[in-house]
Structure formats: structure tokens, C-alpha cells
Amino acid sequence: MIKISNLTKRFDKTVALDRLYLEIGDGITGLVGENGAGKSTLLRCIAGILNPEEGEIFIDGKPRGVLEAKQEIYFLSDYPYSPKAGTIDSIYGFYSCFYDFDLDRFHEILSHFSLPPKGKIVDFSKGMRRQLFIALALSSRTKYLLMDEAFDGLDPIALDEIKGEILKEKENGRSIFVSSHNISTLERLADRFVMLSKGRLAENAETQSLGRNFVKYQAYFETNPTEEQLRSLCNLVSYRKVGSVLNFVMEESAEDLEKIKAAFPPKFIEQVEIDADELVTLAMIKARKDLHQ
């Protein structure tokens, strides 16, 4: 288990992480939050690339700075380093100086892609680089894998292959902590979500419970209530008008819905489905309001 206690990280006067307490256990944990929420900073602190001003990080009970703890963590950054003249073979050799790898597993993952074995990595597209470095990360023999913007640049076919390989690693007992703006992919992979907002923990929930108390309605009123009027009648999360139709999301409450209907009798109202991307976005909006109100 990775245990984080009272973690604070500042950049000049900007507080990137603010007294963060968190435990990361087995399985796949998704890390989400708006830009600037502190996701990359958190991953880099766990990996030992950044040092916090306050707080502690323990890896299976060992302080993060000791060798035994460092050897259990592989960090895949959003733009990993590669020598200018590096090829697939040379980059494997370079990273093998720092980590223990399973070469057969590395080639097994690479077999899903069409990367030129002798091509220079500097000439690879963003997606090709991502395929290579994900293969490298997944073939490392560390217990913990940290992945920053893991799916950025991957085409749908490569993304499906990578998802399958990540699930294999989970089945083999690895703990994976992954950030991504690709919420729909992350929602299908993650066992739980950690959500940051302005450096603070906004949510730490099992995937199936994240935002499940939200309901979305599509309605047509003779006179649309304003956002402020709706907010006075329910725990409003989102409000949007499309022409004469009003879409709004509220925390589930049959009593509040009846209050809305009584105050503004609708000509038409129906509950509509919330997809994974919107669900996480709504949870982020709600968490930000709760933290900073």
C-alpha cells in the first residue's frame, strides 16, 4: 500500500498539494481533476521526482526515499525521456540500467503494434512513443506503476490493446495509479477514483458509486426557471438551456423534484442517462463547490 500523510507541495506561492491524506491499495486507481488540480505533482511526489515541503509518503511501510521503496515504483510521465538517437532496443537497454524488466513481456506487448524496430524514437509520432513507453512500463517488475496521462495520443485500436494489457497487470497483482483525461476509458478500467481539486482531495470512491446520486432531467417549461430559482428548490449541480429545452442535473431527491414541478409545472420532463465523461465532470464540479464554498 502507498500511504500519503499530510502531503503539501508548493511552487513559490502556489500551493499545488494541500495537506493531502490518501491510501492507494491493490488494483487500478484512476486519478482525475481539472487542469492544475495537482495530479502530475502528486504522481511526481510519490515517484520521488519532487520533494514535498511537508508530509510523508510510505511504500509498504517504508519511507519513500529508501532504496527498497524506490525499487517498487515505476513512473511513466506524460513525456518520458529518450536519447536523441535512441531506438527501441537502445531505449530498453537505457532504462534497464535503472529497473528490472521482463524482456519477453516487453516484446509480447510490442507485438500488438507496428513500431519500426530500428527507427529512431525522435521520429516517432506521439502515439507511437506512447505505445513504446507503455510497453516498457508494463514490462517492468515493480509492484507499483504510476502513469501520467496514460492514454494521450493513442488511437482506438492501440487503446483497446493497452487496456487489455493493463488488466493483465492488475490480475498479476500490480497496483496501478493512473491519471487521464480520457474518462470513459478510465471508468472502464478503474476500481476506484481519486479526485483532486486545487491540490486537495475532493473524492475517493469506488467507481460504481462515483456520482451515482446525480440525476439528469430534460424538461420543457412554459416559463423556464432561472438557475438561481432551481438552486433554491434542489441541490443543483448543472444547468444548461438548449433553445427552449432545459437540461439540469441535481442530487437525487423525489421530494425536491416534486417541489420543482409544483413551482414550475413542466409541459414535458424526463430523466436522461448520464455518460461516464459527464458523470466524472459533474462529480468534479460538485466536489469543487463543496471544497471551496
What does each of the following model-derived ranges do?
Residues M1-T8, K289-Q293:
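ABC-family P-loop ATPase nucleotide-binding domain
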Residues I2, K9-D191:
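ABC transporter nucleotide-binding domains
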Residues S5, G25, Y220-E222, V249-E251, ...:
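A structural detector for beta-sheet-dominated domains
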Residues N6, R19, F268-Q271:
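Extracellular/lumenal ectodomain signal focusing on beta-strand-rich modules
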Residues E68, A190, G211-F214, K261, ...:
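Short, flexible helix/strand-to-coil boundary loops that buttress conserved ligand/catalytic motifs
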Residues K163-M250:
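ABC transporter nucleotide-binding domain
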Residues S244-Q293:
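C-terminal coupling/interaction segments
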